[in-house]
From Swiss-Prot:
Keywords: Endoplasmic reticulum, Membrane, Sugar transport, Transmembrane, Transmembrane helix, Transport. A motif (Di-lysine motif) lies at residues 321-325. One of its GO terms (biological process) is UDP-galactose transmembrane transport. Probable sugar transporter. The chain crosses the membrane at residues 18-38, 54-74, 88-108, 139-159, 171-191, 213-233, 246-266, 288-308. PANTHER family: SOLUTE CARRIER FAMILY 35 MEMBER B, SOLUTE CARRIER FAMILY 35 MEMBER B1. This is Solute carrier family 35 member B1. Pfam families: UAA (PF08449).
Length: 325
C-alpha cells in the first residue's frame, strides 16, 4: 500500500518533464513562425516597402505580456509561496536575458531564420561552460557527451551547403556577431538562474514575473530615450495588421515562458537549454514529415545524433554536483 502511494506521488514528477517539453514545443513552434513573419516581412507596396526594425519595442511588448501572465499565475495558483530572492539578482538576470533576446531578434534583420535557429541551437554550450567556470558545477561525463551530440546533430540537420551567390551569402557579419553575443548572454542568464534556484529556491512564476518586470523597466527607458516608441507607433498606424501578430507573438511567448521557467526551477537551466535546442530540431523534423520534404544523408546522421544524445541524457545525465558554495 505504501509502495503504491509512493509510486502515485512520484507520477506527477515523472510527468513534469514531458509536460514542460510539450509546452515549450507547442508554444514556441507558433512563436517562431510569428517572429519570422514580423521581423522579416515586407510592409507596403512597390518601392515604398518597409521592414520592421523595432526590436526593442517588440521585446518590450513581449515582456509586458509575460509579466502580466506571470502575475495572473501567482494570483490564482501560487499566492502562498513567499519570494526571498534579492531584487538585484532579478535585475542582473533581466539585463542578460534582455540582451540575449534583443540581440537574437535584431540578428533576424541580417540573417535568415534557419541561421538564427542554428546559432541559438548552441545555447547549451555557454550555459554549461559558465556553470562549470562561474558556479563551479561538475557535470557527469555523459552530460557533456549528450550536449555535444545534440548540438552537433541539430547543426548537421540544419546545415545547407551554399548553392551559389545570393543575398544571404556571406562569411561572418553583423548578424552572426549578434548571435554570438546572444549566446554569451544566454550563458550568463543561466548562471543567474542557477544561483537563484540554489540559494533562494525561487519559484518559476516569481522568477518569470520579476525578470520581466525589470526587463520592462529597462526597455521602457530604452525606447523612450532612443525615440523608438514613437517610430514604432507610427509604423503600427501605417500597418495596423501587424498589431494582431505582435499580440499573438506576446501571448505565445508568455505561455512558452511559463513552461521554460518551470523547467529552470525544477530541472535547471542546462536541461532547459537542451529542451529548447531539441524543440528547434523537432520543429524542422515535423515540417519534413508533414510536407514530405526529402532528408539528406547528413540530416539523417543529425537525426540519429539528436536521439542518441537525448537517450544518453535520459539514462546517464541526471547527476550534477557542486564543488563549491
Amino acid at each position: 500500500m505504501g509502495a503504491n502511494a509512493g509510486r502515485r506521488s512520484r507520477s506527477p514528477e515523472r510527468l513534469r518533464l514531458p509536460v514542460c517539453f510539450l509546452g515549450v514545443f507547442a508554444c514556441y513552434f507558433y512563436y517562431g513562425i510569428l517572429q519570422e513573419s514580423i521581423t522579416r516581412g515586407k510592409y507596403g507596396d512597390g518601392a515604398r516597402q518597409e521592414k520592421f526594425t523595432f526590436a526593442l519595442s517588440l521585446v518590450f511588448i513581449q515582456c509586458v505580456i509575460n509579466a502580466a501572465f506571470a502575475k495572473l499565475l501567482i494570483r490564482f495558483f501560487d499566492s502562498v509561496r513567499a519570494d526571498r530572492t534579492h531584487s538585484w539578482l532579478y535585475a542582473a538576470c533581466s539585463l542578460s536575458y534582455l540582451g540575449a533576446m534583443v540581440s537574437s531578434n535584431s540578428a533576424l534583420q541580417f540573417v535568415n531564420y534557419p541561421t538564427q535557429v542554428l546559432g541559438k541551437s548552441c545555447k547549451p554550450i555557454p550555459v554549461m561552460l559558465l556553470g562549470v567556470t562561474v558556479l563551479r558545477k561538475k557535470y557527469p561525463l555523459a552530460k557533456y557527451l549528450c550536449v555535444l551530440l545534440i548540438v552537433t546533430g541539430v547543426a548537421l540537420f540544419m546545415y545547407k551547403p551554399k548553392k551559389g551567390a545570393g543575398g544571404d551569402d556571406h562569411i561572418f557579419g553583423y548578424g552572426e556577431l549578434l548571435l554570438l553575443l546572444s549566446l554569451t548572454l544566454d550563458g550568463l542568464t543561466g548562471v543567474s538562474q542557477d544561483h537563484m534556484r540554489a540559494h533562494y529556491q525561487t519559484g518559476s512564476n516569481h522568477m518569470m514575473l520579476n525578470v520581466n518586470l525589470w526587463s520592462t523597466l529597462f526597455l521602457g527607458a530604452g525606447i523612450l530615450f532612443t525615440g523608438e516608441l514613437w517610430e514604432f507607433l507610427s509604423f503600427t498606424e501605417r500597418y495596423p495588421s501587424i498589431i494582431y501578430n505582435i499580440l499573438l507573438f506576446g501571448l505565445t511567448s508568455a505561455l512558452g515562458q511559463s513552461f521554460i521557467f518551470m523547467t529552470v526551477v525544477y530541472f535547471g537551466p542546462l536541461t532547459c537549454s537542451i529542451i529548447t535546442t531539441t524543440r528547434k530540431f523537432f520543429t524542422i523534423l515535423a515540417s519534413v514529415i508533414l510536407f514530405a520534404n526529402p532528408i539528406s544523408t547528413m540530416q539523417w546522421v543529425g537525426t540519429v545524433l539528436v536521439f542518441l544524445g537525448l537517450g544518453l541524457d535520459a539514462k546517464f545525465g541526471k547527476g550534477v554536483k557542486k564543488t563549491s558554495h
